[in-house]
Regions:
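Membrane-interface extramembranous regions
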Residues: 1-209
Length: 209
């Protein structure tokens, strides 16, 4: 049994290069798939809440951050009145998203995400391309993770009735579906840092450093 365990460890110890390749393939799949989905209106509609609340990106949308009064009499950002559930269609809300530049922004973001995924993958063959992709990937994941701070919808907000009933799922650390989607970028960030180190070492070796 001991020899079998040692053999397993010997095999596992030699998986580093395979691991690098798998991380590159994983980032390619995730980024190209998600980037491609940015050309679908339902996906574009879903990112508005993140962008509209970001101090770094909200200027890219025309109307999303405007304050309006909801039918309930609450002052909210305009995008809140134009949210469309996945699989649903509302022509008036779709027209608002066109006016808001939602789809234009989403298409540009999709192209950028796809390009980053491809560059990271190509780092398997060219460390300079990989380095560029990994730096961009790290910047993008930091931007995505910032949504946990800027997006109210990333956290559960229990109603007064729920709180009165003893419901404890309210605020930190209780992530909504949107927040759970964002937090996964921590793993992508870690993988990109590992690949950045690999690309940097390969470039230094080529330079004879």
């Amino acid at each position: 049994m001991n020899k079998l365990f040692v053999s397993f460890l010997d095999c596992a110890a030699n998986l580093q290069n395979l691991g690098y390749k798998l991380i590159r393939v994983a980032i390619l799949i995730i980024f190209v798939w998600i980037g491609g989905l940015k050309f679908a209106n339902y996906e574009a509609n879903g990112i508005v809440k993140f962008v509209a609340n970001s101090p770094f990106m909200s200027f890219m949308l025309k109307n999303a951050s405007n304050k309006v009064t909801s039918p309930e009499g609450k002052v909210v950002k305009e995008y809140k009145l134009n949210e469309v559930k996945e699989g649903a269609y509302d022509p008036a809300k779709s027209a608002w998203h066109v006016e808001n530049r939602t789809y234009t922004f989403s298409h540009g973001l999709g192209l950028l995400i796809c390009a980053i995924g491809i560059l990271v993958f190509l780092g398997m063959f060219n460390p300079y391309l990989g380095l560029a992709g990994e730096v961009l990937c790290i910047i993008m994941t930091f931007g995505t993770l910032s949504f946990l701070v800027t997006t109210p919808e990333a956290w559960v907000h229990a109603s007064p009735e729920a709180l009165a009933a003893g419901e404890y799922a309210n605020g930190f650390p209780y992530l909504t579906g949107a927040g759970r989607l964002v937090i996964k970028d921590v793993a992508i960030l870690a993988g990109a840092v590992v690949l950045l180190s690999q690309s940097a070492k390969a470039i230094l070796a080529r330079l004879g450093k």
